[in-house]
Amino acid sequence: MDFLHHILSTYASFFDWKMWGEVLTDPVSWGLIGSLVVLEGLLSADNALVLAVMVKHLPEKQRKKALTYGLFGAYIFRFIFIGLGMLLIKFWWIKVLGALYLAWLVIKHFWIGEKEEEADGMKKNSWMVRTFGIFWATVISVELMDLAFSVDSILAAFAVSEKVWVLLIGGMLGILMMRTVAKVFLVLIDKIPELENTAFVLIGIIALKMAGSAFHYEMPHSVFFIIIIAAFAVTLIIHYINKQKQVREQTAASKEE
């Protein structure tokens, strides 16, 4: 009963308007919230990349809808997980499932291959697509990944503060940032096709990182960010080389005509 009472008290504090008044007028509170938003933003770069790839197969308008609908689910998961607090540490299996799903996307892209009309990780003959349709099946997949990402984000947030109001405001702003970054990645992938392969390489690294954290091995954030920056730098160089090659081929073809 004490355990249940503790959880209910935590959720009840979300609606303590006096507390919110004190929080929103306290500069120290905003300092903590700002720190958490920055942390969430840095951690959300890889999450946003995964979400961008997951919705890439949809028409442009449906991509935005899928990310928007997934946004509501992400807020719900974040609200629930903040209430549960440190009990998240017991949900290691969510990270394992998320890592396995990401690993499958990488294997399918590089080794198994897929038909052009089949989505990245979302086959048209899969049971989810047959049951819910391609759009809603994609939304469900996004929600499942949000579930795994919520575990990572909340555990990281507890390192900044264990105060409910810091976790709630910082976490909600972090989710919004993740969706914004995901939309930017979608635009970049359309303009620089080589980024798609880079995305799957990084998704493989993310899968290893997520699986490792489930068994208490944490890749240093500095190492992970260096890998991301290096991957994007190499991709831009390859894109430039391919562009120059394409220009030379077009020039040669026009001369032959």
Curated annotation (Swiss-Prot):
The chain crosses the membrane at residues 23-43, 79-99, 131-151, 158-178, 199-219, 221-241. It is found in: Cell membrane. InterPro entries: CHP03716_TM_YkoY, Integral_membrane_TerC. Keywords: Cell membrane, Membrane, Transmembrane, Transmembrane helix. It is a multi-pass membrane protein. Pfam families: TerC. It comes from the Bacteria. Coiled coil: none annotated. GO terms for cellular component: plasma membrane. Belongs to the TerC family. This is Uncharacterized membrane protein YceF. It comes from Bacillus subtilis (strain 168). The lineage of its organism: Bacteria, Bacillati, Bacillota, Bacilli, Bacillales. The gene is yceF.
